[in-house]
């Protein structure tokens, strides 16, 4: 039997479960209100003021820094823009915005980093595959970077005040629409001079293309030697002269310090036989002794001295033409119009007695080029080469009464003995350049002093052998350098003599000056002693030295 009314009571477990459910609902609501209030009031006015002080303390400068930020032109949605920018601001404060420790700016950055860590719970994370979407590289000043950071915090505060859950929006679709291509707004560097590739053909370079100063070697030097002269402040003419064989080194354009580059004119040399097949050009050192008879027969009788009046050498030749003698058998003298860059090829035309004569032994044989004359089976061009001292091509017109050898006759080839006695011959006509006509006329006064003196009134003998000039294989550039005489010293020897002579002169002057100063001091000391010598005698002795010697006791 049960107690009365016991059947209408509820078990205690039922009331306990409902009570726990009510408590859970109240707790969840309070937690939600706390989270919303926490995100809405996360960013205070003090954080924005510290950012403004950070901006005001920066120095205005034109120096730009590189950083990655959101491209607002691609991402139009403001919520997605701030959601992407918030993650990038964290990286910027950690990597770019750095200050010295324990300074007000460094403390402000630490506070902002702590704020961004607390705000991270208010943002939902999107897919990682869109991390670089809508992001590009910016090149701006530090002030502009700080302005962007301040705007991000300010806009985030305004949106969180309106809706604390606004950044839970899914922005994957907006990020997918953006192109992840990184657009660079400015180039990394401004290259002033494009690098020129060294080429053996200067004409292939454009006239308007500037040369890089470090890539253009000095003319006449090898490529390894030109690299050693890059850091030197000497002009091309002041560099040590290096002789280079034209067959072993390619022709390279000279060093240019200007913006424009003019390709040098390459002299045209026709080297062929009657059949038209080109023959290999013999080297300078390899000279066949069997050619002595051929050269002697070709040059000994057909080339006669020029008239002694000197009228033929004074014929003015325009600068735009070059004299090109035709085949000896042709019997004609041709004047060909040349390009503006060509120069005068010869100082005087062929004499009239040389026309119509043809060598008998060299009709079908191509001869090697010796000196300034190279007879061949075909027509050939004559281009003189600049030497260290003026040769017969650049001499002044002789005085009346003194005959002169023709300018086109090879020097020292009148007899076979002189042919073997002169081993050093001209290397190549195409390896050097020719002085302009105006420069030749302007240097006549200096040529007279440098050229070897000739006997006054003595006629030049036709068979007399003149010493061959020492040719310089290194062509001079357009800087107008002085030519050296035959007996002059090399630049290294002159420099060493100068360095030895100046100290020796200074030492001699110092020695002479010291000797004079010593003599002057000695005289100045002797004069007071002579003046004080009468006073040094004792006052009580009226006798002189002679009297003392007389009165000595015996």
From Swiss-Prot:
The chain crosses the membrane at residues 497-517. Changing residue 252 to A: Loss of 43 kDa subunit. Glycans are attached at residues 154, 172, 309, 363, 365. Residues 406-426 are annotated as: O-glycosylated at one site. The modification Phosphothreonine is found at residue 266. Disulfide bonds join 39-122, 80-171, 134-178. One of its GO terms (molecular function) is protein homodimerization activity. Cytokine that plays an essential role in the regulation of survival, proliferation and differentiation of hematopoietic precursor cells, especially mononuclear phagocytes, such as macrophages and monocytes. Promotes the release of pro-inflammatory chemokines, and thereby plays an important role in innate immunity and in inflammatory processes. Plays an important role in the regulation of osteoclast proliferation and differentiation, the regulation of bone resorption, and is required for normal bone development. Required for normal male and female fertility. This is Macrophage colony-stimulating factor 1. It comes from Homo sapiens.
